[in-house]
């Protein structure tokens, strides 16, 4: 398996992966996520790849893209300033899970974050995504905060 930087030629494969996540979210929380044909328009994808504060990776097995990840470099707004590598999205193809691909992708993010001068890696995961919560805990991450809601 090869982990490499994402290119504009990866759009169709990445869109397929992102739709897997979006469809799972829509099944779990239809009040928050509506079904859609594409996770993001091609133009938005291209803009992300051109953004100097965003890095995107794919995991490739033979000719197949089996995982993708978007990471933004942010400056902390806390009293203790630190650069943060924020994982916007990390998706492993459902047919390829439980094979260490997510762990390898996460390790690549860590290497990139250290080289970029980040002091920590952060991400947000919805509480209905127990698979992701379990994976991130196994990678050494710990919960930072919770957001609560009440439907009126």
Question: Residues of each region from the PLM?
Answer:
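A short helix-loop-beta-strand connector motif used in the catalytic cores of GNAT acetyltransferases and
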Residues: 43-58, 86
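Conserved beta-strand in the GNAT
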Residues: 58, 64-73, 91
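Conserved GNAT-fold acetyl-CoA-binding loop/helix
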Residues: 22-44
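Conserved GNAT acetyl-CoA-binding A-motif
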Residues: 113-124
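Conserved active-site alpha-helix within GNAT-family acetyltransferase domains
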Residues: 103, 115, 127-145, 150
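A short beta-loop-alpha structural element at the N-terminal edge
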Residues: 2-16
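Glycine-rich phosphate/pyrophosphate-binding loop shared by adenosine-nucleotide-utilizing enzymes
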Residues: 1, 63-68, 85
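Conserved acetyl-CoA-binding loop-helix of GNAT-fold acetyltransferases
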Residues: 89-92, 98-111, 138
């Amino acid at each position: 398996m090869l982990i490499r930087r994402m290119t504009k030629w990866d759009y169709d494969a990445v869109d397929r992966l992102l739709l897997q996540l979006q469809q799972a979210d829509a099944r779990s929380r239809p009040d928050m996520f509506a079904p859609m044909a594409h996770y993001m328009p091609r133009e938005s994808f291209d803009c992300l790849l051109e953004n100097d504060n965003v890095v995107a990776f794919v995991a490739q097995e033979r000719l197949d893209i089996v995982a993708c990840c978007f990471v933004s470099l942010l400056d902390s707004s806390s009293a203790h300033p630190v650069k943060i590598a924020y994982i916007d999205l990390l998706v492993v193809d459902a047919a390829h899970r439980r094979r260490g691909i997510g762990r390898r992708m996460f390790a690549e993010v860590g290497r990139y974050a250290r080289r970029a001068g980040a002091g920590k890696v952060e991400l947000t995961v919805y509480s209905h995504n127990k698979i992701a919560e379990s994976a991130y805990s196994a990678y050494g991450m710990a919960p930072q905060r919770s957001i609560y809601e009440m439907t009126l």
